[in-house]
Regions:
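N-terminal membrane-targeting hydrophobic helices
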Residues: 1-205, 210-217
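A very general structural signal that marks isolated residues within well-ordered alpha-helical segments
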Residues: 19, 241, 264-266
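Short glycine-rich, polar/acidic loop-and-turn segments at beta strand-coil junctions
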Residues: 45-48, 239, 264
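Generic structural hydrophobic/aromatic packing signal, biased to beta-strands
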Residues: 116, 190, 207, 221, ...
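Anionic group-transfer/hydrolysis microenvironments
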Residues: 136, 236, 263
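Leucine-biased recognition of intrinsically disordered, low-complexity hydrophobic segments
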Residues: 172, 266-267
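Exposed beta-strand-loop-beta-strand "reactive/processing" segments of non-cytosolic proteins
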Residues: 219-252
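Conserved small/polar residues in nucleotide/adenosyl-binding loops
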Residues: 258-264
Length: 268
C-alpha cells in the first residue's frame, strides 16, 4: 500500500486504544512505526535494486519482533517514566510489533508480493485483493483520525482544557469518538479487505467458467485488482494454442481486461 495508508493506519490504531500515553508524540510515533518497514527502499541505489529489495526482510514475519523492539526503543516518549499514562516498555514493544504486522498485512493484500517468509523462503505472498492505492481503504482511515481528534477537541474545550491542538498532552484518553474511530479501523484493515478478497475469488470463478464455456485450454489464470477496484479488474491467463507452426511457441500469454461492476457477470 501507499505510505499515506500505512501511516494513517498506525495513527488510527493509536487513537483507537482505550488509553494512550499523554504525549503529543503518541500519534506521530504510531504513524511512523506503521510506515517504517518501507524504509528498506533507502538501501536501494536504483530501480532494479528497489524491485529486488523492497518488501524484503523488513516485511518478514520473523523480523517483526526485532522491528518492534527497535521502534519501541525509538518511541521513548510512550514509556518514559515522567509521561502521564505511560505504557510499559513491553506494552510499547507489543504495540509496535503489531503495527509492523499490520503493515505486512496491508502489503500482502496487493498484487506486488511481500517476502513474508524470509529468511526461510523467497516466495512472495500476494492476495491480489486491493490495488496499490485504494481510496475505499485510505479515506475511512483519514476520516477516523479527523473524527477522533475532533471529538477530543470538543471535549477538551468543554472541560476547559488547553485549546487543541496546542495542548501538550493528550489528556482525553477516552473520548466519545472511540466507536467511530474503531469502526473506521475495523473497516479498513479487516472488513473491506475481506470483501475485496471475496470479490477477487468470485471474479476468478466467473472468469474460469467463462473461459471453460469458450473451450479454451487455460493452464494458469490470475485476476488482479485494477485502478478503482473493486469496480475494475483485469484477468491474465496462460492459454495453449490449438495449432501452431513448428517455430511458434506452444504457449502464449493472453491478457483480458475486464471492466466489472457488481453483480454483473464477468465479461471477457
Amino acid at each position: 500500500m501507499d505510505p499515506v495508508t500505512h501511516a494513517a493506519s498506525g495513527a488510527l490504531a493509536m487513537l483507537a486504544m482505550p488509553q494512550r500515553p499523554a504525549t503529543r508524540w503518541a500519534l506521530p510515533l504510531a504513524a511512523f512505526a506503521a510506515a517504517a518497514p518501507d524504509l528498506d527502499i533507502l538501501a536501494a541505489s536504483g530501480p532494479l535494486q528497489t524491485l529486488l529489495l523492497h518488501r524484503g526482510i523488513t516485511h518478514a514475519l520473523a523480523a517483526a519482533p526485532f522491528m518492534g523492539l527497535l521502534l519501541a526503543i525509538l518511541a521513548r516518549p510512550l514509556w518514559r517514566y515522567d509521561t502521564r499514562n505511560a505504557w510499559s516498555f513491553g506494552g510499547v514493544w507489543a504495540f509496535m510489533m503489531l503495527l509492523v504486522l499490520l503493515h505486512i498485512w496491508l502489503d500482502a493484500l496487493t498484487t506486488y508480493g511481500t517476502l513474508v517468509w524470509l529468511p526461510f523462503s523467497g516466495e512472495r505472498l500476494r492476495l491480489n485483493a486491493v490495488y496499490i492505492i485504494d481510496l475505499l481503504m485510505t479515506l475511512p482511515l483519514l476520516w477516523g483520525i479527523w473524527h477522533g481528534l475532533r471529538q477530543e477537541k470538543k471535549r477538551a474545550q468543554a472541560q476547559g482544557a488547553i485549546p487543541f491542538p496546542f495542548q501538550d498532552t493528550a489528556s482525553l484518553t477516552v473520548s466519545d469518538g472511540k466507536p467511530g474511530v474503531r469502526l473506521a479501523l475495523f473497516w479498513s484493515i479487516l472488513l473491506y479487505p475481506a470483501l475485496a478478497l471475496g470479490c477477487q475469488i468470485w471474479h476468478t470463478q466467473q472468469m474460469q467458467a467463462s473461459l471453460a464455456a469458450q473451450g479454451r485450454d487455460i493452464r494458469q489464470l490470475v485476476v488482479l485488482p485494477d485502478a478503482f477496484a473493486p469496480l475494475f479488474w483485469r484477468a491474465l491467463y496462460l492459454e495453449k494454442l490449438p495449432a501452431r507452426p513448428a517455430d511458434a511457441p506452444a504457449w502464449q500469454t493472453a491478457v483480458s481486461y475486464t471492466h466489472l461492476t457488481l453483480p454483473t457477470i464477468l465479461l471477457v
